[in-house]
């Protein structure tokens, strides 16, 4: 049985979102002009090189340590830093907009965002978007409370599992295509991925499934006493998604930029700002 739960956020489908997009771009230009104008040491050439960069609007949602807001309300995280550096090298400036994750495909197809970047797996979605090559790899895993009798994936039979809606874990538990994953009693599909943790902690669910990195981050931030099962659901490649009708070639150019960043060590250096073992995300692990 599947249950879906929703929360109210900015209505991204409305004309207000398009106004927001225009306002963000204009605001970015104004802020750059003001900031650069206060720096007397910069030349006119340097000022122009910054203010003239076209804006790439990146759609994402809150998912530490990949994308979240810092103490000042500014977007930060692995994906934010990677996007800013990669697009800078390509001659653009990246600007993140928090979206309803379930609306991501509609938003990018309508051009209200330029791409989707937020710990997003291409596995099984290859035909839905134009994808970059994977820039990182992540294990999708199951976590349970420390005192749980669930030790293996097989022990999930007849249990209740919390997942975020429209994610790979939701697909795996509902599709019944992987013989390793048993039928569970209930799948709680939550629009806000942060809610999967209280669902497990409060006992509404017997297990949760998500990216291992995100689970470990949440365990650290909130002192959660969870145990991650040894056997992963799967290992996925994380990519950046563009609309299939996008003809700018940004997906291919971004893939080449990722290769450059991998080769010069900047990819590992950026991930290392947030994780103690960045190399684990740079290679496929069983």
Q: Model-derived features: where do they sit?
A:
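Extended ligand-binding regions for polar small-molecule ligands
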Residues: 40, 80-89, 150, 154-168, ...
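Short glycine-rich His-centered loop
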Residues: 53-78
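Periplasmic-binding protein-like
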Residues: 60-62, 137-144, 220-259, 277-286
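Ligand-binding cleft/hinge of the Venus flytrap
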Residues: 69-71, 83-92, 169-191, 219-223
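Acidic, polar ligand-binding/catalytic clefts
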Residues: 80, 84, 93-155, 227-232
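Short helix-initiation/N-cap motifs at beta->coil->alpha
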Residues: 80, 95-106, 187-198, 202, ...
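A conserved helix-loop-strand patch within extracytoplasmic ligand-binding domains
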Residues: 92, 100, 133-183, 187, ...
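A ligand-binding cleft/hinge motif common to bilobed small-molecule-binding domains
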Residues: 103-106, 119-128, 172-175, 199-235
């Amino acid at each position: 049985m599947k249950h879906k739960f929703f929360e109210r956020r900015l209505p991204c489908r409305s004309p207000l979102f398009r106004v927001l997009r225009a306002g963000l771009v204009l605001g970015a230009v104004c802020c750059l002009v003001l900031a650069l104008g206060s720096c007397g040491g910069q030349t006119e050439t340097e000022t122009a090189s910054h203010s003239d960069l076209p804006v790439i609007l990146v759609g994402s949602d809150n998912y530490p340590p990949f994308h979240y807001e810092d103490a000042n309300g500014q977007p930060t995280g692995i994906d934010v830093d990677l996007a800013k550096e990669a697009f800078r090298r390509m001659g653009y400036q990246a600007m993140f907009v928090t979206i309803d994750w379930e609306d991501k495909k509609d938003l990018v197809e309508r051009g209200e965002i330029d791409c989707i970047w937020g710990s997003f797996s291409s596995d099984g979605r290859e035909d839905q978007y134009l994808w970059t090559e994977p820039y990182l790899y992540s294990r999708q895993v199951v976590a349970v409370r420390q005192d749980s009798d669930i030790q293996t994936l097989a022990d999930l039979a007849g249990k209740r599992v919390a997942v975020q809606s429209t994610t790979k874990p939701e697909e795996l538990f509902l599709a019944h295509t992987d013989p390793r994953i048993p039928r569970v009693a209930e799948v709680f599909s939550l629009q806000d991925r942060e809610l999967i943790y209280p669902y497990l902690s409060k006992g509404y669910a017997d297990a949760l499934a998500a990216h291992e990195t995100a689970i470990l981050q949440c365990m650290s931030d909130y002192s959660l006493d969870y145990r991650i099962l040894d056997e992963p659901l799967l290992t996925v490649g994380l990519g950046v998604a563009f609309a299939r009708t996008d003809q700018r070639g940004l997906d291919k150019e971004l893939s080449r930029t990722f290769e450059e960043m991998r080769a010069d060590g900047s990819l590992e250096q950026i991930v290392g700002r947030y994780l103690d073992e960045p190399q684990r995300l740079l290679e496929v692990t069983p």
